[in-house]
Amino acid sequence: MKAAVIQEIGTPLAIEDIPDPEPGLSDLILKVGACGICGTDLHMSENKDPNVGWRMMHPGCVMGHEFAGEVMEVGREAKQHWNPGDRVTALPWIGCGECPACQAGLGYRCPNVISRATPDLPGAYAEYCRVGARETIRLPGQVSFREGALVEPLAVGFNAVR
């Protein structure tokens, strides 16, 4: 599949062929319908100081954590709740599902969380991406993929003032 990949921090992204994602037992594979460009993506892709910001940006990294798309594949343990063709958005991580934080619905506090834009979980600046079924939100029919890609940044703003 095609993806926009970091070649070197501070240089433009390059379109490359990378392997298609494969679903884990409780994962979904999405065909990306829309993906936003977050200010964090811009800052991280330009940051050459290893002591500032996330250290996950590296050559070969695929960013993109504000996205929506269509479910194409469903992992065996997710088939009860998800089907190919479902229109969704997802959180920018996959939690383990087992720890107290995940059990309480606080996957972002999971000690084993896998964050998007890392080697283990490439982002959505690609044709397809892998998401955790627990971290996925179904989009109503009247919500476009472009609007669905705004769910994550809208949630950040909402929770900031809540």
Where are these regions (language model features)?
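NAD(P)H dinucleotide-binding glycine-rich loop of Rossmann-like/cofactor-binding domains
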Residues: W54-M56, H65, I94-R162
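Short N-terminal binding/cap micro-motifs at the start of the first secondary-structure element
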Residues: G10-I15, G39-T40
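Residue-level signal for short segments within beta-strands and strand-turn junctions
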Residues: V5-Q7, E46, E73-G75, Q103
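Cytochrome P450 core scaffold surrounding the K-helix E-X-X-R motif
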Residues: T40-E46
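Short, solvent-exposed secondary-structure boundary/capping segments
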Residues: L42, H81, C110-P111
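Glycine-rich beta-strand-centered segment in the early N-terminal region that forms part
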Residues: P21-G36, P50-P100, P140-Q142
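Extreme N-terminal starter segment of soluble prokaryotic enzymes
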Residues: M1-K2
